[in-house]
Every structure is written in structure tokens, then in C-alpha cells.
Design a protein with these regions (language model features):
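Catalytic cores of secreted/periplasmic lytic hydrolases that degrade extracellular macromolecules
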Residues: 2-139, 143-258
């Protein structure tokens, strides 16, 4: 009887621990989660083994397209949330505490400074929280990863040429200049890599021209064109204007394959 009582107490304690972990701990909302695609952690195809150029390109685009669409859908979810809060603000309706927490998280995530003028905050957020055309992502990742054959893509899901600056955060480039401390970022899965890449385009000062072009297209109710947005990516590569010219060429020549 004594043993049964001890077992009963132990089970009760265990249930309380489980309850506290899953129900009392603060949970990330859908807005804050990095969405994980079905293929996020799957092995990366060996694109180098595909000798026929057209087939290699098709395989590359087919592998990455679902991930781009997944992350863009998540960005639109965040954007819809901001639109909803702005509508409440205009209507002078009360923004709830949980909604304000979400708003503050988005401001931090997209590097928008706090301001008493909420209209300004919403405008800045909506300029940053927006999609990047699938075609642009596909050709840029192809360019940066040598069609998925670079070691950074194969071993670290980095199809984007993204750097990191904490020792051990990624791969040390073989051709890194003396005194340089950067590494090429390594990601645990494709979803995290794609999320980080799109967030980088949407919040880094280097790409504010790209965001301005996108906003202008939105304001004019025109489609967000991959070719148009390339004009804002001169700072993505040391090659500057030549890099933009190459991206445009890749968009044009691979249109039928994407």
C-alpha cells in the first residue's frame, strides 16, 4: 500500500511537470514560428550528378520552389496581421496585450524602432514584411550556390551566400582574406536557411532600395516583378551592377524552366 502511494505521488508530480512544460511555458505564436516545409531536413539532392544541364536546372528549381512558397506564405501571414492591427488603429479600436506583444516581436525581428507614431511603425513594417518573387529567389540561389553544388549548400543548406560573424557559426572560406573574421553561415535545415535569407533581404539596410522598388509596385497596384527587384540588389555582391545584369539574364533565360 505504501509503495502504491509513492507511485501515485510520483505519477502526479510527473503529470504536473509535463503540464507546466507544455501549457504554462510561453509558446511561440504562428507569427513568430519559422515554418518548416516537408523537405526541410531531407538530404540535399546531388545536383552535380545530373549531367544534362536542363534536367539539372529543373531539379534545382523543383527542390527549392516549395520552400520559397512556404516562407512567402508565412511572410504574407505576418503582413496580414500588421494590416489588421493598422485597421484597428485607424478605427480607434483597442489593440490587445497579446497583439501588442506580437507587434513588438515583429518590430524587433524586422529592425523597426519603437515610435509613439503607430502609423509610421505600420508603414515601416509593411515596407519590410513582404514577399520576394519566387523567380528572383530561384535564380539568386542558383547563382550563389553554383546550382546547388557548392559545399556550403551541400553541407549547410546555405544556397544564399550568407555570412555570419561568430567564431564557429559556419564554414571558414578557403579564400578568406588575412585578418577577416567572417564565416559562411551553416543552417540546420532548408527552412531556417530560407527564412534567414528572406529576412535579410527584408530588413538589412543594404537592400532598402529593393524594398523601395517593391513598395512602389505595391502602391501602384502592379505585380511584384523579379526583374524589377534585381535593381535593388547591387550591394548583394561585390560585382555590383554586373551581378544585377547576370541575375536579369538568368531570369530571362530560365523563365520556361521555373
Amino acid at each position: 500500500m505504501h509503495k502504491l502511494k509513492i507511485i501515485s505521488i510520483a505519477i502526479t508530480v510527473l503529470l504536473l511537470v509535463v503540464f507546466s512544460v507544455y501549457f504554462l511555458q510561453p509558446q511561440k505564436s504562428e507569427i513568430q514560428e519559422i515554418p518548416q516545409s516537408v523537405s526541410a531536413k531531407q538530404a540535399i539532392p546531388d545536383f552535380a550528378e545530373i549531367k544534362q544541364t536542363t534536367e539539372k536546372k529543373k531539379a534545382f528549381f523543383s527542390y527549392l520552389r516549395p520552400e520559397v512558397e512556404t516562407q512567402n506564405a508565412h511572410i504574407l501571414l505576418q503582413r496580414e496581421f500588421v494590416h489588421g492591427l493598422r485597421a484597428k488603429h485607424i478605427a480607434e479600436e483597442q489593440i490587445t496585450e497579446s497583439q501588442m506583444e506580437e507587434l513588438l516581436w515583429l518590430m524587433k525581428e524586422y529592425r523597426v524602432e519603437e515610435n509613439d507614431d503607430l502609423d509610421l511603425v505600420f508603414d515601416k513594417l509593411l515596407t519590410r514584411i513582404d514577399i520576394v518573387p519566387v523567380e528572383l529567389v530561384l535564380v539568386q540561389t542558383a547563382n550563389e550556390s553554383a546550382w546547388g553544388t557548392s559545399r556550403f549548400a551541400r553541407k549547410g543548406y546555405n544556397f544564399f551566400g550568407l555570412w555570419c560573424f561568430r567564431k564557429g557559426c559556419g564554414f571558414v572560406p578557403k579564400r578568406r582574406n588575412d585578418g577577416a573574421a567572417h564565416e559562411v553561415a551553416k543552417f540546420d535545415d532548408l527552412s531556417t536557411g530560407m527564412y534567414t535569407y528572406l529576412r535579410n533581404l527584408n530588413r538589412h539596410d543594404a537592400y532598402k532600395e529593393m524594398r523601395a522598388i517593391r513598395k512602389q509596385l505595391r502602391d501602384q497596384m502592379k505585380p511584384i516583378s523579379a526583374t524589377a527587384l534585381t535593381e535593388g540588389l547591387t550591394k548583394y555582391s561585390e560585382r555590383g551592377d554586373d551581378y544585377v545584369v547576370e541575375l536579369k539574364h538568368m531570369i530571362r533565360t530560365n523563365q520556361d524552366l521555373m
